[in-house]
């Protein structure tokens, strides 16, 4: 018989840097999950990912206080900022442009994000990432 699910916890945790401090500790503690067990498992699973890259994680908590978790790919905005070497996007994306992104860069990011996107094909995924880039105040070339 399947375990009874008591809830889901969605967090963004930096790869290889999960520790019991906020936001991880309080979110897991109020559900009765063993915090250190999660931190060790998360850090072990993300050891091959670039350290410090924020990863969305969905933790499923069961009635017996056990858990499972699924890590997702980093947010598109983080990957775009990393690809262009930016600290942040534009505060006024419609008027102030902070950089230019090429189709090749968009395709590279779309390949990485493809498992988490609902896009039917690569072209749709590239357009999705291009939309994120435009919202950040980036000029999109070749789309």
Swiss-Prot record:
One or more lysine residues are methylated. InterPro entries: Ribosomal_uL11, Ribosomal_uL11_bac-typ, Ribosomal_uL11_C, Ribosomal_uL11_C_sf, Ribosomal_uL11_CS, Ribosomal_uL11_N, Ribosomal_uL11_N_sf. CDD domains: Ribosomal_L11 (cd00349). Keywords: Methylation, Ribonucleoprotein, Ribosomal protein, RNA-binding, rRNA-binding. Pfam families: Ribosomal_L11, Ribosomal_L11_N. GO terms for molecular function: large ribosomal subunit rRNA binding; structural constituent of ribosome. GO terms for cellular component: cytosolic large ribosomal subunit. The keyword RNA-binding applies. GO terms for biological process: translation. SMART domains: RL11. Gene3D superfamilies: Ribosomal protein L11, C-terminal domain (1.10.10.250), Ribosomal protein L11/L12, N-terminal domain (3.30.1550.10). Part of the ribosomal stalk of the 50S ribosomal subunit. Interacts with L10 and the large rRNA to form the base of the stalk. L10 forms an elongated spine to which L12 dimers bind in a sequential fashion forming a multimeric L10(L12)X complex. Forms part of the ribosomal stalk which helps the ribosome interact with GTP-bound translation factors. HAMAP family: Ribosomal_uL11. NCBIfam families: L11_bact. Belongs to the universal ribosomal protein uL11 family. This is Large ribosomal subunit protein uL11. It comes from Methylococcus capsulatus (strain ATCC 33009 / NCIMB 11132 / Bath).
